[in-house]
Amino acid sequence: MHGLLLAAGLLSLPLRALGHPNPNPQMHTLSRRGAVDLDAFRLGQNAEYSNTASVASNPPALSIRSTQSYVDVAKDLVKTTLPDATFRVVNDHYVGTNGVAHVHLRQTVHGIDVDNADFNVNVKDGKVFSFGNSFYKGKIPEENPMVKRDHADPVKALKGVVSALKLPVKTEKASAAISAQSQGQDAVVFKGTSGALSDPKGELVYLIKPDGELSLTWKVETDVGDNWLLSYIDAKDGKNIHGVVDYVADATYQVYPWGINDPTEGEREVFTDPWDGNASEFTWISDGRTRYPTTRGNNGIAQDNPSGGNQYENNYRPMSDDLRFEYPYSTDMSPPDSYIDASITQLFYTANVYHDLLYILGFTERAGNFEYNNNNQGGRGNDYVILNSQDGSGTNNANFATPPDGQPGRMRMYTWTTSRPNRDGSFEAGIVIHEYTHGLSNRLCGGPSNSRCLNALESGGMGEGWGDFMATAIRLKAGDTRETDYTMGEWAANQQGGIRQHPYSTNLQTNPLVYTTVNQYREVHDIGTVWASMLYEVLWNLIDKHGKNDGPKPELRDGVPTDGKYLTMKLVIDGMALQPCNPNFVQARDAILDADEALTGGENKCEIWAGFAKRELGTGARYDRSRRTGSTDVPQECQ
């Protein structure tokens, strides 16, 4: 068998902070949106989280044990906590690599899902470890809408969504047909429309509105490219929008790599068969059934997409019967399509390396990762990542769409027009890492079948922050110390100092962001910078304690990374799976502490607390929708 040869780059010089950044506000905007601000329709944050410490002092939770299964433990906890609630078990439960089982349950009313009412239970050693809850606790409607049937028909709901959100979808000839794929009682697919990338869908669900009231809604799904929306429109009047979820996550920056941060910092090299045999058992160029002489395999399929459309299978991608994917590229080449082979190869390489690393750190088939053939390892297959290089639907940006497990993720990488010649985001591995991390966090938070759990303002901000953090952690070099600062977006944006307000730094003068800073922000990338700054503090505390592995993947001892860098990444990933749907900063902090308790027995508790407390997320920190309270306190045993 011929070895796969991928042209890629190795970093030779770290990128340092270059004084005070000068953010470009245009790059902090969302990518489409037209005249409608979708942020105004974000769902509220109403989740509660009981961490492992609070469970230890909760007699009802402690008393629940089962000799049957961890699913029974979860069901019994819900019945004990909310005895009058009706619910169903979501079919995406699994046991993580840290030994913690994750079960997700959805509240129902009259057999209809309450779409944002979730209960997640984490079970370890047959006992409740921690849990999150956003179930509706108010008065349940007495009348069953399926009997009375006084709600608007689904076509009216679709037209109401298109009109209210100004979507580019034509609905004059729309009709609704019963959907055979959904579990919902009233689930339809809309035929006869145009303008969407696939047929819109509709389903009758309840929704907890921002004011806390329960409302019957039509959930209308529309994929219009830059936005893949779930819109909740009032089922009675077919006019009022009560909430919107967007599967697409935007980025306004480019960042770091394993090999090269940007083309100015090193030379491309040739790698032979670079995959990890455990994470990618079929290699990168096979799905277990077919071996492809191109940039296609079990984890991803990479191609150009100059039209910006939804079709990809027949798009251009480089072919090589001898599997030598070596193509010329230099920053002087123009136009971008003159080096499209090199661009596609670089994107394919970076996405696959990250897939393999995340697999080692626990993002496996059971957890909802992105693979076409899951090889009987759990989860749902048929969902590699569609990787579009030089996508024609936009510029100066990138995005990632994360539908539920079993449907492909979609990454769109754009060219950047902020320099001459234009630059290609696929050569910035940090952009790819950030975007792919949206897929990671959306699949883990709330479970693989629920991609709606990072849609509130603060949780959406953390979604951006995790992308920044993972890319920064991967970017660390052998000579770096806690005094090393990193800026964001300098090469692609052609902007000295990057596109964030502050570089990532452990120096509070260089980066003064703290928890209460979030009170000033209403934009997810700004909020995400605060969250990533906190994680950067935790990262260096654990590196100082355990050292730093500068290799491309961690060394594990009993499933625990032996160094501080990969340990922090592992705890952050495990915390995503523990936390409730749409968490706030305090709950996500507690989930990371719980992740350390589950993985190491709490060995790093004080280092984690110190990192968060330095930036006001200490023991006394409190979340309130209108005002956050900061605290620099740590537990007494850590003082």
From Swiss-Prot:
GO CC terms in record: extracellular region
Active site, per annotation: 435
Cofactor comment text: Binds 1 zinc ion per subunit.
Cofactor: Zn(2+)
Listed CDD domains: M36
Enzyme Commission number(s) from the entry: 3.4.24.-
Residues cleaved off as propeptide: 20-250
GO molecular function annotation: metalloendopeptidase activity; zinc ion binding
Protein role: Secreted metalloproteinase that allows assimilation of proteinaceous substrates and probably acts as a virulence factor.
Name of the featured protein: Extracellular metalloproteinase 9
Gene of this entry: MEP9
